[in-house]
Swiss-Prot record:
Pfam families: Glycos_transf_4 (PF00953), MraY_sig1 (PF10555). This is Phospho-N-acetylmuramoyl-pentapeptide-transferase. One of its GO terms (biological process) is regulation of cell shape. It is a multi-pass membrane protein. Its cofactor is Mg(2+). It comes from Lactobacillus delbrueckii subsp. bulgaricus (strain ATCC 11842 / DSM 20081 / BCRC 10696 / JCM 1002 / NBRC 13953 / NCIMB 11778 / NCTC 12712 / WDCM 00102 / Lb 14). It is an enzyme of class 2 (transferase). Keywords: Cell cycle, Cell division, Cell membrane, Cell shape, Cell wall biogenesis/degradation, Magnesium, Membrane, Metal-binding, Peptidoglycan synthesis, Transferase, Transmembrane, Transmembrane helix. Belongs to the glycosyltransferase 4 family. MraY subfamily. It catalyses: UDP-N-acetyl-alpha-D-muramoyl-L-alanyl-gamma-D-glutamyl-L-lysyl-D-alanyl-D-alanine + di-trans,octa-cis-undecaprenyl phosphate = Mur2Ac(oyl-L-Ala-gamma-D-Glu-L-Lys-D-Ala-D-Ala)-di-trans,octa-cis-undecaprenyl diphosphate + UMP.
Length: 319
């Protein structure tokens, strides 16, 4: 546990030192987030806020994880796979953010380009897992444990791509995705500690350290956004952690807010295409509550509480 706390501190200190520099650099070069037209009108005042903060906490977490695991002689293939998930999806987000900044509009990679890259990273993770004699066993409700490489591969790809996008959808308010991710990684850190999975524990704690530093600059009013470089990386990392702890379904509760955010978008699109009517005032659902008059802080606090409750329920029943 002491080593994981050191990983937390290394990541926190590195991030805390680098964020001010990144903010100053972006402001001096007039680089900042362009707010999408279809979002709430009052978000337009956030236009120009520095972004790509995810690059800092992702790299800091990776450095801390490698340093501590290497020092302890526990730099296993599982740790490398988790880093591939974090860095792989982070690079996709970095490319997306870079295009947004270059063209000065809130568009980046085309949807098909982003999806192809996400599938490519997921496929790479599956191949790495296969080379490590990973147990391709998947528990299915009402069917029990099923050992089928093809089925597990499809599930793993869906899980990685799905949750990387789910966290991305949740990153729409100051501090929201940061707090939710901190809670989720904290839950998995505890599960890894209980199961004595050193590599996963260090990885989760390192990510938490970076997020703790980032929150100092991302709470309302945000001085910097994480961008897709952060949100895609966090989601991919969470999915990978849940899989390599042998608890993939846990993410439905631990990441319940991410699931609800994604479901709200799917339901909204399906309803509008089939009936011409919208279920929510705006999606993802955090914007719906904004449209009802909730402040950003109220949405943050309520959603964080839901995330805590979801994680708490999982830990009480299955932890």
């Amino acid at each position: 546990m002491q080593a994981s706390l050191i990983a937390f501190m290394i990541s926190l200190v590195l991030s805390a030192l680098l964020f001010p520099w990144l903010i100053i650099w972006m402001r001096s070069h007039d680089e900042g987030q362009q707010i999408r037209d279809e979002g709430p009108k009052w978000h337009e005042k956030k236009s120009g806020t520095p972004t790509m903060g995810g690059t800092v906490f992702v790299l800091s977490a990776a450095v801390a994880t490698v340093a501590i695991c290497a020092y302890k002689g526990q730099l296993s293939k599982t740790v490398w796979i988790l880093l591939v998930a974090l860095l792989g999806y982070g690079i996709i987000g970095f490319l997306d953010d870079g295009l947004k900044l270059f063209f000065k509009r809130n568009l980046g990679l085309r949807a098909w380009q982003k999806m192809d890259l996400q599938l490519l990273v997921a496929a790479g993770i599956v191949l790495l897992a296969a080379s490590d004699n990973f147990d391709f066993a998947l528990y299915l409700p009402f069917a029990g444990v099923v050992k089928n490489v093809v089925l597990f591969t499809l599930f793993e790809v869906f899980w990685l791509v799905g949750f990387s996008n789910a966290v991305n959808l949740s990153d729409g308010l100051d501090g929201l995705a940061t707090g939710l991710s901190f809670i989720a990684y904290g839950t998995y850190a505890w599960l890894a500690f209980k199961s004595q999975n050193f590599g996963v524990l260090v990885f989760c704690m390192a990510v938490m350290g970076g997020l703790a530093a980032f929150f100092m600059f991302n709470h309302k009013p945000a001085k910097i956004f994480m961008g897709d470089a952060g949100s895609l990386a966090l989601g991919g990392g969470l999915a990978a952690v849940s899989i390599f702890l042998g608890r993939p379904w846990s993410l439905l509760l631990v990441g319940i807010v991410f699931v609800c955010e994604t479901a709200s978008v799917i339901l909204q699109v399906a309803s509008f295409k089939t009936t011409g009517k919208r279920i929510f005032k705006m999606t993802p659902i955090h914007h719906h509550f904004e449209m009802l008059g909730w402040s950003e802080w109220k949405v943050d606090l309520v959603f964080w509480l839901v995330g805590l409750v979801g994680s708490g329920i999982y830990l009480m029943i299955w932890g």
